[in-house]
Design a protein with these regions (language model features):
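Structural alpha/beta surface segment adjacent to cysteine/selenocysteine redox centers
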Residues: 3-82, 86, 91
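C-terminal cap of thioredoxin/glutaredoxin-like
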Residues: 4-6, 12, 17-22, 78-142
Length: 142
């Protein structure tokens, strides 16, 4: 199992995602929006959590990381529609205190775990910051 802390607007997180999604390992995702560098990171995290409430977290997660050129509001709605989400519910949920708290909770747990950059993967309790390299990939799959 790999626990990953990532920012959905971070280009390094997008690179890590492309590697991790191909590996035969269970992934647990935690939001770590670095808003000082990525101003839409918290909005995108809320969108992913709103999609999760309709059972489509990973689809929204993948869509955001795999097309970072289109992370503005109109494209969020387009993604939500393409995923078959109830748009009214999606909008309500992504602005809800519960979703905001979920994202904030993930961020706080990352801080407590020592996350200082994105992406950071935890494997066997050890933090591994940055895009996974060949040695770490080999450990993930052994």
């Amino acid at each position: 199992m790999v626990l990953e802390y990532a920012d959905l607007e971070c280009p390094y997180c997008a690179r890590a995602h492309l590697i991790l999604k191909e590996l035969p390992v269970r992934r647990v995702f935690r939001h770590f929006p670095v808003t000082s560098k990525h101003p839409r990171a918290r909005v995108l995290a809320a969108a992913a959590e709103a999609a999760a409430l309709q059972g489509r977290f990973w689809e929204m997660h993948d869509s955001l990381l795999e097309d970072q050129a289109h992370l503005d509001q109109p494209h969020l709605w387009e993604r939500a529609e393409r995923l078959g989400l109830d748009i009214d519910r999606f909008e309500r949920d992504r602005r809800s205190p519960e979703v905001e708290e979920r994202v904030a909770h993930d961020f706080r747990t990352g801080i407590r775990a020592g996350v200082v950059t994105t992406p950071t993967q935890f494997f066997e309790g050890e933090p591994h910051p940055g895009v996974p390299g060949p040695d770490l990939i080999a450990r993930f799959t052994s």
